[in-house]
């Protein structure tokens, strides 16, 4: 088991700008909790299915997550994995997010650190499984982040990497781009990827793609509206929840639609040494 004392001692001084750190610290400190919204429950259902279908049994598995936003504000997927017996590790650029994320763990404590996904403070081959959903699109040098994820994954280990789907049929990338241009997007800089582009980036990082799917078959605007109602107008959340339900129903009963979710989810493995 990797412990904090096993973290790399040779990590270079962070090149992350202070403005970037301040932005995410402010988001982590002031962003409302999204847990309990209908679309968040649907999101959580999707994530648990990914874990069940693409990771080995979680008991004793060293699972690393590339940000702790979900643990602080959203699905609490890593805390769920911990309750299934996984050994949970994660980093986030925001100290308030790391502090809040730790509170979600009630079985075993989270080994969490304030760090940049492009400069991970862990030794090579530290983890059996890596879950990175909605992280690397927020940094301009996404390939560097993927190389770091590949470095800390053990040979034979599996990674699930998720990013916004450039070809989302409900055009969420256009909505996000418009909000960014207006300075209204809560998550700062974000880019989207095609399935092919993500696959090629993973391969350049030294990983072998073994499966491609997606999660959140739902219009991005509906997810945003549902969260807004959950936070600021609970009576209307019943309405948005009813609108979420048909998409969740299709997802459960017509698996073919999952390919069109607004977050790609590509599964990759790290080749065994000498393989």
Report the location of each language-model feature.
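A C-terminal cap/extension of S-adenosyl-L-methionine-dependent methyltransferases
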Residues: 176, 211-275
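A short acidic, Gly/Pro-enriched loop at the edge of an enzyme's catalytic core
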Residues: 118-129
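Short alpha-helix
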Residues: 189-206, 212
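Acceptor-substrate binding/catalytic loop of class I
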Residues: 38-42, 180-197
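A short glycine-rich, Lys/Arg-flanked "PGG" loop and its adjoining helix->strand segment in the class I
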Residues: 143-158
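Conserved class I S-adenosyl-L-methionine
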Residues: 2-59, 158-182, 223
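Class I SAM-dependent methyltransferase SAM/SAH-binding core
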Residues: 62-119
């Amino acid at each position: 088991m990797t412990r904090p004392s096993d973290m790399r001692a040779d990590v270079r001084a962070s090149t992350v700008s202070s403005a970037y750190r301040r932005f995410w610290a402010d988001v982590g400190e002031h962003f409302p909790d999204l847990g309990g919204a209908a679309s968040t429950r649907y999101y959580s259902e999707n994530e648990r299915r990914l874990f069940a279908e693409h990771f080995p049994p979680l008991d004793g598995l060293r699972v690393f997550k590339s940000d702790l936003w979900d643990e602080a504000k959203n699905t609490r997927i890593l805390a769920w994995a911990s309750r299934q017996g996984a050994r949970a590790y994660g980093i986030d650029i925001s100290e308030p997010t790391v502090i809040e994320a730790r509170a979600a763990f009630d079985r075993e404590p989270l080994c969490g650190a304030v760090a940049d996904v492009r400069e991970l403070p862990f030794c090579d081959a530290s983890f059996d499984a890596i879950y990175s959903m909605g992280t690397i699109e927020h940094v301009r040098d996404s390939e560097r982040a993927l190389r770091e994820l590949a470095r800390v994954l053990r040979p034979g280990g599996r990674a699930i990497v998720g990013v916004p789907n450039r070809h989302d049929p409900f055009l969420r990338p256009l909505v996000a781009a418009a909000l960014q241009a207006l300075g209204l997007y809560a998550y700062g800089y974000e880019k989207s990827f095609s399935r092919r582009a993500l696959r090629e980036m993973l391969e350049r990082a030294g990983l072998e793609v073994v499966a491609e799917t997606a999660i959140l078959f739902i219009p991005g605007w509906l997810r945003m509206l549902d969260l807004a109602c959950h936070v600021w107008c609970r009576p209307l959340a019943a309405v948005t929840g009813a609108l979420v339900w048909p998409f969740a129903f299709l997802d459960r009963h017509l698996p073919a639609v999952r390919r069109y979710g607004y977050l790609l989810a590509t599964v990759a493995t790290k080749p065994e040494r000498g393989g």
